[in-house]
């Protein structure tokens, strides 16, 4: 048989066995010798991808590896493979955390197994069912889907299945459906025991990565960061820096470090993880990476880059058919627009989310985040009481779910809305309680990125006398560090923001703003500018929206800081 070799492989050195095996794999696939091809693929291309073997090809291996993987997978997908080969492909994809590819292979197996020997199909079918359940637990956030998958895994566990992968999947599934008693009943894996084979090695990475998420939800950030860092180091050692497994751990670690205020070097960590996610990662890893990259850009005042990042996230979500990621990306865009005072554009983003597939309506976490975004929009458009009502509903719904981090974020936003409504006593009490929780946990960015009313109260608390018993003394250093970080971010973002606001304010709004700075009422401003009081009121509302403020005093102070007066 004449085998045509890919020209990319002809640049490899003769001694490089993996490249020759890749060529053989291509040839046997073209000749329909699928079992031989699968064996060659297992020995060569998958090993190269898993180990990120840069010596397998001359020069920079990444373009060649990408081209080879694309060609081989396209050939394999168009060729009828045996059921066992399909299961092996699904298993290999699971090991590398290519969830969508693994599910596709399982689905193809189920189609092919109907033509296979009945006994072989039955045995393989049981294994495929467990494999599908593992994949769905890792991928899905829908409670009904996860519960159905857990039923399969529990049956396997009762029949003697004790693998680390099964244990990790059970714990992940129980936490997702909020069955906390069963979650804690399943023993934790001993992550200190080294293991390097198959999904056992995967379990020692994905397991602690998910446990880091759980610890973060419990506001034990130090423990969470330690688990995520250990999982990331193990993933880099086992799979290399640019693999979906490493990206999962890197995304969790990056979000934890950002919340703790440790932002140095995060760009590089996130960019490495996104390089893997763009080709074969999962939507959770992608969302974590894009979320951190967006917040880092906004933190340094580079909103143009932040919007470009979100655009790439939306394009990837559309290409990979990830409606959950599309919704989350649009919510991030809406929050960024609200920070710039662009409430109309933010409202359009939220409306786009509501047109996404109906299955998202059963995603409780996504619906809660959407309600959170709607409340932020209401607060930004002067409807603080309606916003406070939504935040209270979210706070009530979060009780019993053991996600203290989410509850803390709601409390901070609720305090901001109440302060804007004039409910200073309740708003202050909620904020002080949130500060006590945040100080113990080491939370920073949640308060640094809080609304203007919270910032003003933090400033007031910081300058209160030591005799002020309403503020616990241990909170003073914590508040000081939050205000210091907020001041640094303000200094970075003010020039760009001042330019945008200056361009957006009309000449008449400038005139009204200058009159407001002199303490004039709407009636006096109307007389001075010879316009109707209703027109002044409309201009004041436009100024509030463009400056992203909620009171006249805050509008004047913000305009002064931006150099508009």
Report residues per predicted region:
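Alpha-solenoid helical repeat architecture
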Residues: 37-42, 77-86, 117-131, 158-172, ...
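Amphipathic alpha-helical segments of tetratricopeptide repeats
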Residues: 69-74, 107-117, 150-159, 190-197, ...
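Structural motif corresponding to the intra-repeat A-B loop/turn of tetratricopeptide repeats
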Residues: 96, 139-140, 177-179, 218, ...
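Single-residue signature of alpha-solenoid repeat helices
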Residues: 102, 146, 183-185, 224, ...
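Linker/hinge segments immediately adjacent to helix-turn-helix/homeobox DNA-binding domains
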Residues: 404, 430, 435-507, 514, ...
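Helix-turn-helix DNA-binding segment
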Residues: 491-550, 554-565
């Amino acid at each position: 048989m004449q085998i045509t070799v890919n020209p990319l492989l002809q640049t490899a050195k003769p001694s490089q066995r993996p490249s020759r095996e890749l060529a053989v794999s291509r040839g046997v696939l073209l000749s329909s010798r699928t079992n031989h091809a699968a064996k060659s693929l297992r020995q060569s291309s998958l090993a190269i991808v898993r180990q990120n073997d840069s010596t397998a090809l001359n020069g920079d291996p990444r373009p060649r590896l990408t081209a080879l993987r694309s060609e081989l997978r396209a050939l394999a997908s168009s060729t009828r493979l045996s059921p066992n080969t399909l299961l092996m492909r699904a298993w290999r994809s699971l090991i590398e955390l290519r969830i969508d590819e693994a599910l596709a292979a399982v689905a193809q197996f189920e189609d092919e197994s109907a033509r296979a020997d009945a006994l072989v199909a039955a045995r393989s079918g049981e294994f495929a069912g467990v494999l599908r359940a593992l994949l769905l637990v890792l991928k899905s956030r829908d409670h009904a889907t996860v519960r159905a998958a857990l039923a399969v895994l529990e049956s396997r566990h009762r029949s003697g299945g004790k693998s680390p992968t099964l244990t990790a999947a059970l714990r992940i599934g129980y936490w997702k459906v909020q069955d906390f008693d069963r979650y804690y009943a399943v023993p934790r894996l001993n992550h200190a025991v080294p293991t390097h084979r198959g999904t056992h090695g995967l379990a020692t990475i994905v397991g602690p990565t998910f446990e880091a998420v759980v610890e973060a939800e419990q506001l034990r950030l130090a423990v969470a960061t330690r688990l995520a860092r250990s999982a990331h180091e193990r993933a880099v050692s086992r799979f290399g820096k640019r693999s979906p497994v490493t990206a999962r751990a890197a995304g969790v670690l990056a979000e934890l470090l950002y919340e703790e205020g440790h932002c140095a070097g995060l760009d590089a960590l996130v960019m490495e993880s996104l390089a893997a996610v763009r080709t074969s990662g999962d939507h959770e890893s992608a969302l974590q990476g894009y979320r951190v990259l967006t917040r880092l850009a906004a933190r340094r005042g580079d909103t143009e880059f932040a919007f470009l990042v979100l655009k790439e996230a939306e394009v990837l979500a559309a290409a990979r058919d990830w409606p959950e990621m599309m919704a989350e990306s649009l919510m991030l865009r809406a929050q960024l627009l609200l920070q710039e005072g662009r409430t109309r554009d933010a409202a359009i983003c939220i409306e786009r989310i509501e047109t996404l597939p109906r299955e998202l309506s059963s995603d409780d976490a996504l619906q809660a985040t959407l309600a959170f975004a709607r409340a932020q929009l209401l607060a930004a458009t002067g409807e603080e009481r309606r916003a406070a009502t939504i935040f209270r509903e979210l706070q009530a719904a979060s009780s019993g779910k053991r996600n203290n981090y989410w509850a803390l974020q709601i409390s901070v936003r609720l305090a901001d809305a109440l302060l804007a409504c004039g409910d200073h006593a309740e708003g202050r009490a909620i904020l002080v309680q949130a500060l006590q929780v945040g100080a113990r946990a080491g939370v920073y960015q949640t308060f640094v990125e809080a609304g203007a009313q919270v910032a003003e109260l933090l400033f007031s608390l910081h300058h209160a006398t030591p005799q002020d018993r309403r503020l616990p003394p241990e909170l003073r250093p914590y508040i000081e560090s939050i205000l210091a970080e907020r001041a640094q971010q303000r200094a970075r973002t003010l020039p760009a923001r001042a330019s945008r606001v200056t361009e957006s304010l009309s000449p008449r709004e400038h005139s009204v703003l200058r009159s407001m700075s002199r303490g004039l009422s709407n009636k006096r401003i109307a007389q001075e500018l010879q316009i109707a009081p209703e027109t002044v009121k409309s201009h004041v509302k436009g100024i509030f929206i463009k400056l992203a403020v909620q009171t006249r005093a805050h509008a004047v102070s913000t305009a002064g800081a931006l150099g508009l007066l």
